Amino acid sequence: MTRRFTRLAWTAATFTYLLIILGAIVRITGSGLGCGEHWPLCNGKLLPPLDLPTLIEYGHRLAAAAVSGLVAALAAYAWWLRRGAGSGERYPPGKTAYVALALLALQVLLGAVTVKLSLPPWTVILHLGTAMLLLATLIVAAKLTPGASPGIPRTPPLRPALYALALGFVTVLFGALTANLGAASACLGFPLCNDQFIPAGSYLQHIHWTHRLFAYTLFAYVVWWAARSKRPGPWYVVALVILQGAVAAAMVLSGLPQPLQAAHVAVGGAVWAALVLAVL
């Protein structure tokens, strides 16, 4: 029973991670309104004619439907197990699956509002933030299921780990803000912003620079955290943050090509997942 629940939770988490990347591809390619302002239908149809923007957005919606099914199944399975069905004893897997279901409902609502309002930046940012929280919750559901990791004692997360997690989440949100307000090209050059430590230009430069400052702070903090920790998890975070910095530098210095923009989101999602795992 435990293994099935854990496998289902990991499957849902993996699909959620892939959905985050696909959502970024929708934004990067300008396909957010590939289905028009219709929701849940696409251009008023269940099976619309598929040009490239429509194909990308429709694929994103189908992937979201798959994630919805997995999360709903996980919550239903958790409820079934908590009632002790199919076994001779009560077996509680925890309530994180219910939290994931609530986050999924919020995510679906934000997705609908985002499309209906023609992609305002604030809803797109909230949409990504909620997706990251959903991913984290599913990872917690998989890792903290009783019996999922036999023989490994559970210790409560220390404050440095929680600070790293909070800093990572804020960095992700400022990255979404930078991308969705059109500030990605406001800071040329790397690591400085237009060769300035304190940009003197528009508010878009300040938004972009704030995202970078959070990223630099995250790197310094996780190195300090890893050096103090006796666990290997923080060092995996350090490695992924270094990779993310390399992708970001290449992206900015090469004029923001779409593949590197997508890679930036993919590695950013991996950093977030690694932070969650390192905290547990």
Task: Outline where the language-model segments fall.
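Polytopic transmembrane helical bundles with strong interfacial aromatic enrichment
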Residues: 1-280
